[in-house]
């Protein structure tokens, strides 16, 4: 069944959108399987994205989990950052090999993020690469400033954690001012009510959010592995269930090509004869070269053509060429070539040895 890939930075509402889509599909009686970081790691851990080796292992585990679940019965939803276009292409190839449709849902949060990180331009053009700006908090007297303190009259982001995610408000006063912890929920209550996200067990530090935003490769509908593409800006925009449903269940699956389609298996008799004929040719060649001198034409068993002898040949070299010939012939089986197998192998040896 189809594969739905969710893409976006942390705190963009991906998990909430996944729950919406899963609930809608299950209400229609469809079986839905969700693959996310927590399912693979055992618990959601944001520090994975700060270590390239661990992140690479995570992508491999996510890809393997998706490949195991792809079937004709269940809808598979991948809930992860999926910010690398090369990884999205690998997922596209998995769906193509399974002959099942695929679509991409890109979640963008237009507002501010934790620690002062802001994504600009997402509202104007959600399909382009977003720009990122972030400024760490300054220190005064060797100690970090309190949350919400202004520096030299410049507004400083006030971060708070509401429902285990970060929100931000920018005070308008130019005077340094302390914001009490008791007042923080009131500053962001209205925003949190509008954009409450699915609870996440991971907290992304500002430095990690900035790094993820800088290396984020936004989806582009011009790429075949990024379409059909559905871009959702903010949590207020409704999920396009009708369009997603049409992309998953009404569109044709991408056709397989040579890299994703299994090669036809050769019959047992063909493989047996191929192995037998090539072995006889090698045995005859090793025996004939014992009394041959360079320039002689060697007549080998089962062949009507001759092989010009130029130098002594080792069994290791001939065995390597035999394996290459067998691998190529198995992918291009043709029963009409059975009588010519010995001559074909002799021609292959003649071209490879000179």
UniProtKB/Swiss-Prot annotation:
Mind telling me which Pfam families this protein's record contains? KTI12 (PF08433)
Gene Ontology molecular function:
ATP binding
SUPFAM superfamilies xref list:
P-loop containing nucleoside triphosphate hydrolases
Positions bound to ATP: 8-15
Keyword vocabulary terms for this entry: ATP-binding, Nucleotide-binding, Phosphoprotein
**Which interval of the chain is the signal sequence?**
none
- Which domain of life does the UniProt lineage start with? Eukaryota
GO process annotations (BP):
tRNA wobble uridine modification
**Where in this protein does the record say Phosphoserine is found?**
200
- Gene3D superfamilies named in the record: P-loop containing nucleotide triphosphate hydrolases
Q: Which InterPro entries match?
A: KTI12/PSTK, P-loop_NTPase
KW Metal-binding (keyword) present: no
The entry assigns this protein to a family as follows: Belongs to the KTI12 family.
What this protein is called in its record is Protein KTI12 homolog
Q: Which organism is it from?
A: Bos taurus
Q: Which gene encodes it?
A: KTI12
């Amino acid at each position: 069944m189809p594969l739905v890939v969710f893409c976006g930075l942390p705190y963009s509402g991906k998990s909430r959108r996944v729950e919406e889509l899963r609930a809608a599909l299950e209400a229609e009686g469809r079986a839905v399987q969700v693959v996310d970081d927590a399912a693979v790691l055992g618990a959601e851990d944001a520090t994975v994205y700060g270590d390239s080796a661990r992140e690479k292992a995570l992508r491999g585990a996510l890809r393997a989990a998706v490949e195991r679940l792809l079937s004709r019965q269940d809808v598979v939803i991948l809930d992860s950052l999926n910010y690398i276009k090369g990884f999205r292409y690998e997922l596209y190839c998995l769906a193509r090999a399974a002959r099942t449709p695929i679509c991409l849902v890109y979640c963008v949060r237009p507002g501010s993020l934790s620690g002062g990180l802001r994504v600009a331009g997402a509202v104007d053009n959600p399909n382009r690469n977003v720009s990122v700006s972030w400024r760490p908090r300054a220190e005064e007297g060797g100690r970090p400033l309190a949350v919400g303190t202004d520096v030299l009259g410049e507004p400083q982001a006030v971060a708070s954690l509401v429902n285990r995610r970060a929100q931000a408000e920018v005070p308008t006063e130019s005077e340094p001012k302390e914001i009490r912890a008791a007042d923080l929920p009131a500053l962001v209550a209205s925003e949190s009510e509008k954009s409450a996200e699915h609870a996440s067990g991971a907290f992304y530090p500002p430095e990690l959010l900035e790094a993820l935003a800088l290396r984020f490769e936004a989806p582009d509908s011009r790429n075949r592995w990024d379409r059909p593409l559905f871009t959702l800006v903010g949590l207020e925009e409704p999920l396009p269930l009708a369009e997603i449903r049409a992309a998953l269940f009404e569109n044709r699956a991408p056709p397989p090509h040579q890299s994703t389609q299994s090669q036809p298996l050769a019959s047992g008799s063909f493989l047996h004869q191929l192995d037998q004929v090539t072995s006889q040719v090698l045995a005859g060649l090793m025996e004939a070269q014992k009394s041959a001198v360079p320039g002689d034409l060697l007549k080998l068993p089962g062949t009507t053509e001759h092989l010009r002898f130029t130098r002594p040949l080792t069994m290791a070299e001939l065995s390597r060429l035999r394996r290459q010939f067998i691998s190529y012939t198995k992918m291009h089986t043709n029963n009409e070539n059975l009588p010519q197998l010995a001559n074909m192998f002799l021609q292959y040896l003649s071209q490879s040895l000179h």
